[in-house]
A protein has these predicted regions:
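Juxtamembrane helix-loop-helix connectors linking adjacent transmembrane helices
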Residues: 20-94
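Cytoplasmic juxtamembrane interface segments
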Residues: 10-32, 106, 163-164
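Transmembrane helix-loop-helix hairpins at the membrane interface
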Residues: 49, 80-184
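Transmembrane helix-loop junctions in multipass membrane proteins, especially transporters and channels
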Residues: 15-20, 56-64, 132-136, 160, ...
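Hydrophobic alpha-helical membrane segments
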Residues: 3-7, 40, 143-151
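Alpha-helical transmembrane segments in multi-pass membrane proteins
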Residues: 1-18, 68-71
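Polar low-complexity intrinsically disordered regions
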Residues: 5, 9, 42, 77-78, ...
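Helical transmembrane-bundle signal
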Residues: 4-7, 45, 173-176
Length: 184
């Protein structure tokens, strides 16, 4: 959480002269992308459900019910006093930080030097890989590739509007957070 705050402060200080008007215009453009955001989140769940069905055909040693990353996060919910901090981290900070890193830095900034298409792929693979550090099955990367691919698709379709992907990521994480809190 502290690292996330530091990253956000550094990003703000680097862009303090022009961040406010850009952020305002990008968030104002959100309205016209609501259907895309909601549709893409629904597609994430559809693709993940289909992926889970396909996992049943793998040898048992490669199958999994939940990713190790999700199991680790679920363990944190056993301490009730942590829930407000987890909300701040999972629903608020993480979408901002991950979108700044994976969409703004990797795609937007490196895409200027290399190609945007290549950086789309790099962003997806790094995002997914970092969410699977403790994975027991190599196929645990699948759900994260699905999530990252849909976010990158939305980022591309909206003309690389970071406000849209932050919102999409926030909604996706909020749904996951509610599922964890309700113990579903």
């Amino acid at each position: 959480v502290i690292g996330a705050f530091i990253l956000l402060i550094v990003f703000y200080l680097m862009h303090k002269n022009n961040i406010k008007p850009i952020a305002i215009s990008r968030f104002k453009a959100l309205k016209k992308h609501i259907i895309l955001i909601i549709g893409s989140i629904i597609m994430i769940y559809v693709f993940e459900s289909f992926y889970q069905i396909l996992m049943q055909f793998l040898p048992e040693k490669f199958q999994f019910n939940d990713t190790e990353n999700n199991k680790d996060i679920a363990k944190m919910f056993t301490h009730g006093w942590l829930v407000p901090f987890l909300f701040l981290d999972i629903v608020i900070l993480t979408p901002f930080v991950e979108e700044l890193i994976f969409r703004h830095l990797i795609i937007h900034e490196l895409g200027k030097k290399l190609t945007y298409g290549l950086m789309y792929i790099v962003s997806i693979l790094i995002f997914a890989s970092l969410h699977c550090v403790g994975a027991k099955s190599p196929f645990e990367i699948g759900p994260y590739i699905i999530i990252a691919s849909m976010i990158v698709f939305v980022y591309h379709k909206t003309g690389r509007n970071l406000a849209v992907t932050i919102t999409m990521h926030t909604i996706n994480n909020a749904v996951s957070f509610l599922i964890m809190v309700m113990g579903l």
